[in-house]
């Protein structure tokens, strides 16, 4: 095993890349082979038998899908490559977003038999958002139905990308025998099963015509992007391979083209040329535009990738670790940092000490003495740092652009099975929500239940699974819940009189009050209109308190009441018997009496839902929304996609992630936030109240 830690390469020889793909395109296998050929692994792991290095959580080994982006470092031809493995399942897009934010480039892996699949579109859109340069790998060329030309065309059609093949396959399915390098115009074959012996040879006669035609296409596409090549191409001059690579690198870095490679990671064919492509076409930290940040005066500053600049880094992932507690992954953008030194968390305004710095190799770790600009590293010792926080030098405080995380869209109640589980639960939930900003946990004051919220049903399933496995906490899972409210529709007046005479000191409180409906965004307002001291000043706060407490439990179904203004009009008091308690009780009596006359109604949370879908699924999606009592507000276009905005009651949205996935073959995505509370239709309200 080569030691990585001693090798600090020049910045231009560093690559920070992600590997992104649809769930079954063979991404983890591709990563595995990269680790094998770069000498980081002695035996080849396989997802099918659960020995893949990157999929190191137990759930991943069982489900065969990648959930956590593990960061790994390896060497290839005196370059260092840091790889972030990203999940391909739609419930984990937060992991993909967070990885893309700290990467410089990416390999997009496609299944050559399926071409662009639904999640590939989602991930591609996320990569577009962060302007991440990409190269593509058409994997599974040995699979039945593998069709390189179809797969490349699907990139143009579905992703609106500009794919430029730099290789073509020799054969496909079970006759797949190697690849042709269209720049060098050589055939590449692998001689052994493990794919370590690779030879370049002349192109076999039967593939020559096709290879020449594809090289011509490559030059034509490059000529459109590069003036120098255009001139030489039109003049019929010989264009050198060096010039082709230079022009293609520039086009890739500007996101104007995507070089396409092919092979079969599982059959150990095509991975080494793909690694060469990472060095050839993907950016080093020096090729990236400077990162923007803001200093303590709120002025924008540029953070340059230079180890002589002050230290600046972005924490992009927290991982709860059973052995060391908490690992904080961060990307260093400038400067250098020694282990044992202090960093300033400018987001929180706190200083923290880093006890250890670690380069991660999937689930193994190597301690290092220092890190510098360009590195992706894990640290131990940062207690207060959360995902998205900036770490920097106290002498030059800077805050980098925050990461945006979507609001959770599904909630369920959980309860511990035993008292022992209860004690462990809150600690475990705190650790898990530190680790994953799209996961929330809180105790509902109204019901006393522990509620967990996340990005989808699979997301919460895995959280519950992790509670059991990693934290030995067993929980029972309830049905998804909705937080209803109540309000009044018309003004009403009532009198509240509380008198008790039973020997000794009595109780006396008397109020006359009016209650009016106000905007539902306001919970409660209080106005005192008492004149001439008919109720002494010291009892007025008790009147307000009495109404506030009574409003916590509504008349119809016991839900909290909102949108009410209470006006104290009149009343009376007793020199000896009046007390704060008596006025509190009198006020709550007046409130309960008035609410009955004020036409109380039930309110429900209404969500603002935004759905992004390819056009062909729009009709089905809108029909389904209508069946959920939705009000469609607008339909917009973004390229070949349609954006549907609608208001939908939360109670109608349970199971929506799964339904939308099946209506659009997984190609549509949605976000959902609370828009307002609105009156529940009478028929539905009757059903809820009768429960």
Curated annotation (Swiss-Prot):
GO terms for cellular component: cytoplasm
Binding annotation for GTP: 21-28, 85-89, 139-142
Gene3D superfamilies: 3.30.230.10, 3.30.70.240, Elongation Factor G (Translational Gtpase), domain 3, P-loop containing nucleotide triphosphate hydrolases, Translation factors
Domain named tr-type G: residues: 12-286
InterPro entries named among the record's database cross-references: EFG_II, EFG_III, EFG_III/V, EFG_IV, EFG_V, EFG_V-like, EFTu-like_2, G_TR_CS
GO BP field: ribosome disassembly
Subcellular location as annotated: Cytoplasm
Keywords: Cytoplasm, Elongation factor, GTP-binding, Nucleotide-binding, Protein biosynthesis
Cystine pairs: none
Keyword ATP-binding annotated: no
Functional description taken from the UniProt entry: Catalyzes the GTP-dependent ribosomal translocation step during translation elongation. During this step, the ribosome changes from the pre-translocational (PRE) to the post-translocational (POST) state as the newly formed A-site-bound peptidyl-tRNA and P-site-bound deacylated tRNA move to the P and E sites, respectively. Catalyzes the coordinated movement of the two tRNA molecules, the mRNA and conformational changes in the ribosome.
Protein name: Elongation factor G
Organism of derivation: Thermosipho melanesiensis (strain DSM 12029 / CIP 104789 / BI429)
